[in-house]
A protein has these predicted regions:
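Active-site-adjacent betaalpha module
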Residues: 1-12, 44-52, 69, 76-199
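Catalytic metal-binding/acid-base residues of hydrolase active sites
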Residues: 19, 62-63, 140, 166
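Short amphipathic alpha-helical segment that frequently serves as the phosphate-/nucleotide-binding helix
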Residues: 35-43
């Protein structure tokens, strides 16, 4: 399945919210990301996509300094308003070492909201580049990655998730969400299988 998708459709790698502030705000997320070794794995995937001339897209959250467009309608939004985390231009909002955007990469950022298709140019950007398959990596397997996967399927993309390139705050919850939720809408695979399928 993955070989057919990556061999017959144009794919893009989407690196979601791999930012310093996420791991500062949520230490358990940082610990899981480190334990699972997702940063070097994502870096390898990104290098493979770039080598094939395929798009690498970063989807960070970078809040406006006055936080005016962050509505207190969820626990995460309330936490952002309380901590003033991930403000554009601050260290919190910057990318983790090794996953900074390269000159030919794309960045589709948002200042509020839960997932990267909402309130951004991501869908239009993908359409204009002729992308049909999206490969999702980054954080978190609890919220951001499922949100991207559901929206991606609704927008008629094929969705691939290398499970060893995503992380959440708890491994047990991660496993349940991958098995009971993500696999229903996405092809679950590994970094090595994606690289092999790229050829």
């Amino acid at each position: 399945m993955i070989e057919k998708l990556l061999g017959s459709t144009k794919a893009a790698l989407i690196i979601n919210e791999m930012q310093l502030g996420n791991f500062k705000m949520f230490p358990a997320l940082g610990a899981e990301a480190e334990r699972r070794g997702i940063v070097p794995k994502i870096a390898q995937l990104a290098a493979a996509f770039r080598a094939k001339g395929l798009p690498v897209i970063h989807t960070p959250t970078m809040h406006h300094p006055n936080l005016a467009d962050v509505k207190r309608n969820s626990m995460i939004a309330s936490f952002v308003l309380k901590t003033r985390a991930m403000i554009k231009g601050t260290e919190d909002a910057w990318y983790v070492e090794g996953l900074e955007p390269e000159p030919d990469d794309h960045v589709s950022q948002r200042s509020s909201g839960i997932f990267a298709f909402q309130g951004t140019d991501l869908n239009v950007r993908l359409r204009r580049m002729g992308v049909e398959t999206i490969v999702l990596v980054g954080v978190s397997s609890t919220l951001g990655i499922p949100g991207l996967a559901f929206a991606g399927v609704d927008f008629a993309y094929h969705v691939i998730v290398p499970e060893d390139c995503i992380a959440g705050t708890d491994q047990k919850v991660h496993e349940i969400l991958v098995q009971e939720q993500l696999r229903i809408v996405a092809t679950i695979t590994t970094k090595d299988e994606v690289i092999a399928a790229l050829g």
